[in-house]
Amino acid sequence: MKYNHTVDYGLYLVSDRDVLKGRDFIKSLEEAILGGATIVQLREKEASSLEFYQLALKAKALTEKYNVPLIINDRVDIALAVDADGVHVGQSDLPAHIVRSMIGQNKILGVSTATLEESKKAAEDGADYIGVGALFPTGTKTDANPVTLDQLRYIKENMDIPVVGIGGICEDNIKTIMEVGIDGVAIVSAILGKENIKEAAESLKASIK
């Protein structure tokens, strides 16, 4: 592990403006943080570089206010430009060891994985945590191969860095997932897609304690 500060991965919010249906982006992130989100990842695959940068600047100001880490998905340049707390990359993004060399030792590096082999490689390459999934069908990532709870447990038991579950996690399945013993859950629609974002986050937070 490279990042020296203690990070609570418990309720890991991942952004998606599409599920907000036109609601204010930063206000929605704030509601999620007030409801208990412990870390925020900005994931905006469709945004232009300028738009992503402007969103990231606003998100950084918000997360700093609440002392919550801000992670940027994929875009190392944006993360460095706004001095985000870290970067999260997938298997088809820049290799983790390259990202680590770019962001240095004092930023958080997360890597998406689906197997123990990928997870071990991520740790060797300098990852601080891994996001394992997709655990359930999800509208935000249609190409993800499902990971079973038994596979998730196997990965967790064989890893020394924090493991975050991702993919289709909601109030109906969150307790079952947390019983595996992982360190947190990454949530998109089950928070940002709800009418009352703060209440949705509070309810999920209560389920992981």
From Swiss-Prot:
Mg(2+) binds at residues 74, 93. Pathway: Cofactor biosynthesis; thiamine diphosphate biosynthesis; thiamine phosphate from 4-amino-2-methyl-5-diphosphomethylpyrimidine and 4-methyl-5-(2-phosphoethyl)-thiazole: step 1/1. Pfam families: TMP-TENI. Keywords: Magnesium, Metal-binding, Thiamine biosynthesis, Transferase. It comes from the Bacteria. The keyword Transport does not apply. It catalyses: 2-[(2R,5Z)-2-carboxy-4-methylthiazol-5(2H)-ylidene]ethyl phosphate + 4-amino-2-methyl-5-(diphosphooxymethyl)pyrimidine + 2 H(+) = thiamine phosphate + CO2 + diphosphate; 2-(2-carboxy-4-methylthiazol-5-yl)ethyl phosphate + 4-amino-2-methyl-5-(diphosphooxymethyl)pyrimidine + 2 H(+) = thiamine phosphate + CO2 + diphosphate; 4-methyl-5-(2-phosphooxyethyl)-thiazole + 4-amino-2-methyl-5-(diphosphooxymethyl)pyrimidine + H(+) = thiamine phosphate + diphosphate. This is Thiamine-phosphate synthase. Belongs to the thiamine-phosphate synthase family. 4-amino-2-methyl-5-(diphosphooxymethyl)pyrimidine binds at residues 41-45, 73, 112, 141. GO terms for cellular component: cytoplasm. One of its GO terms (biological process) is thiamine biosynthetic process. Its EC number is 2.5.1.3. Binds 1 Mg(2+) ion per subunit. Its cofactor is Mg(2+). Condenses 4-methyl-5-(beta-hydroxyethyl)thiazole monophosphate (THZ-P) and 2-methyl-4-amino-5-hydroxymethyl pyrimidine pyrophosphate (HMP-PP) to form thiamine monophosphate (TMP). It comes from Alkaliphilus oremlandii (strain OhILAs) (Clostridium oremlandii (strain OhILAs)). 2-[(2R,5Z)-2-carboxy-4-methylthiazol-5(2H)-ylidene]ethyl phosphate binds at residues 138-140, 168, 188-189. Coiled coil: none annotated. One of its GO terms (molecular function) is magnesium ion binding. The lineage of its organism: Bacteria, Bacillati, Bacillota, Clostridia, Peptostreptococcales.
